[in-house]
């Protein structure tokens, strides 16, 4: 506890650290510093940023060690990151008894628990919500002054209006060193794999991608066996790198390669889903397209478990699901393939897949995850049409032609001829588990079900 029994009289502000685990290019921190003499940084473990994170997950390990990195960075400036199991209201009220607190600064968010916390905080402290995203959802509107619902129009308007973004720069850090005892976080029971947490690592990855991969990104990005993507998503999820800074750097390279433009579009898809969740908050829980909120998905716990464990009999699906469980990450092309398989081959509710992904992914972001699942299922904003159904065999042959990716995650298929790896059921010998379903039969059923539903709900 604080040793001083008297309130320290000075103008302090609280930086509530949530999804911005970095010092540099952090608008929340910059605004706090502009209006305060010293900053008291706090991280509350009570909700662990979202309810799906558990101590066994790679996401928790990534967060835990990411906090350690931030803690060390703050200590270099003679400050202390308060890490507490208390809720934000209790710790804020306690600090207010010891310091003259001017305001609490925090990055804005869409999570329900965050919105409720802010409402309560405003009863006893001035709260400053800061937008660290690329897009200001309230000002980027169409010609009718309404929110965009089509990605291409959203992206076009954004690029026309934002050739760069404001981001904090050359900040002088001034942190308060409190005597508040930190609570001990549970030590992770898992590792963070290939994703080393922290701001320094995030910046190294970005610079490496920008120098070596971004110019061919449009050519290589879909191939599952190639290491051609930035793999910055975990760092963006926890704010270990500024999306404004990377956009501002990449937009300068826009005319040099289609790869740069394509990668910027992927960043903007992330922003688009956040934007949609702000303007249409119901879409976080329900289908964006309201007519599909009564769609008759099927329940099949056996199929769901087989999909989760990577035991569907389709090697491309199984390899992707093994990768997810082992690493906490999956290639974006893989995510679309397995999502299509769950919703349109197994006919299982997209929410089951979305929930499983959030439990497994290091980069599990609410808006992007829900947006991506609804897009593939054909029920979301600017979604793929219901009749777009990924053929797992064709996807396998196109994006992993020599089965390098598949055999990495399913090594028992290593010595099998490639044509049988993509379609093991064609072999006279039993070289792999039986497939759960026949894709063509499932596809026909899905098309019929969607057509029938649409005819009755126009």
Kindly label every feature range from the protein language model.
Residues 1-79, 432, 442-443, 447-451, ...:
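N-terminal beta-strand-loop-alpha-helix module at the start
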Residues 11, 227-410:
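Active-site-proximal binding-pocket segments
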Residues 15-16, 80-83, 103-107:
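Short catalytic-loop micro-motif centered on adjacent basic/acidic residues
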Residues 24-28, 116-118, 353:
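Residues at alpha-helix caps and immediate loop-helix transition turns in enzyme cores, especially N-
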Residues 41, 81-85, 129:
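A structural preference for short, hydrophobic beta-strand core positions in alpha/beta folds
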Residues 87-197, 373-376, 393:
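Beta-rich, aromatic/charged-enriched effector core domains that present basic-aromatic interfaces
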Residues 146-291, 399-400, 404-458:
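Glycine/tryptophan-enriched, flexible segments
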């Amino acid at each position: 506890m604080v040793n001083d029994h008297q309130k320290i009289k000075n103008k302090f502000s609280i930086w509530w650290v949530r999804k911005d685990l970095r010092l540099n290019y952090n608008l929340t921190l910059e605004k706090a510093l502009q209006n305060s003499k010293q900053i008291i940084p706090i991280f509350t473990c009570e909700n662990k940023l979202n309810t799906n994170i558990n101590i066994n997950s790679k996401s928790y390990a990534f967060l835990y060690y990411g906090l350690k990195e931030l803690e060390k960075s703050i200590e270099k400036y003679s400050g202390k990151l308060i890490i507490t199991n208390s809720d934000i209201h209790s710790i804020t009220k306690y600090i207010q008894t010891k310091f003259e607190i001017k305001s609490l600064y925090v990055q804005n968010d869409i999570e329900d628990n965050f919105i409720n916390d802010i409402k309560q905080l405003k009863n006893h402290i001035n709260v400053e919500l800061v937008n660290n995203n690329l897009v200001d959802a309230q000002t980027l509107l169409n010609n009718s002054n309404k929110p965009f619902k089509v990605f291409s129009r959203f992206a076009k308007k954004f690029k026309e209006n934002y050739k760069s973004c404001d981001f904090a720069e050359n900040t002088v850090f001034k942190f308060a060193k409190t005597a508040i005892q930190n609570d001990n976080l549970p030590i992770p029971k898992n590792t963070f794999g290939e994703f080393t947490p922290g701001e320094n690592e995030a910046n190294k990855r970005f610079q490496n991608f920008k120098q070596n991969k971004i110019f061919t990104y449009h050519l290589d990005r879909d191939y599952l066996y190639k290491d051609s993507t930035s793999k910055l998503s975990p760092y963006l999820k926890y704010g270990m790198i500024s999306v404004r800074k990377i956009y501002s750097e990449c937009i300068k390279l826009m005319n040099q390669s289609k790869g740069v433009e394509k990668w910027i579009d992927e960043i903007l898809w992330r922003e688009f889903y956040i934007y949609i969740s702000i303007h249409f908050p119901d879409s976080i829980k329900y289908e964006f397209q309201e007519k599909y909120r009564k769609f008759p998905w099927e329940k099949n716990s056996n199929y769901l478990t087989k999909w989760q464990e990577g035991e569907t009999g389709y090697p491309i699906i199984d390899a992707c699901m093994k990768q997810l469980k082992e690493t906490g990450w999956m290639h974006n092309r893989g995510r679309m393939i397995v999502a299509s398989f769950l919703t349109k081959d197994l006919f299982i509710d997209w929410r089951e897949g979305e929930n499983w992904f959030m439990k497994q992914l290091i980069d599990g972001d609410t808006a992007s995850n829900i947006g991506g699942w609804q897009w593939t299922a054909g029920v979301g904003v600017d979604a793929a049409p219901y009749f777009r159904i990924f053929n797992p065999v064709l996807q396998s042959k196109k994006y992993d032609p020599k089965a390098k990716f598949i055999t990495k995650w399913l090594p028992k298929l290593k010595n099998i001829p490639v044509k049988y790896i993509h379609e093991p059921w064609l072999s006279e010998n039993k070289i792999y588990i039986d497939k759960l379903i026949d894709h063509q039969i499932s596809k026909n059923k899905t098309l019929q079900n969607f057509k029938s539903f649409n005819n009755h709900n126009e």
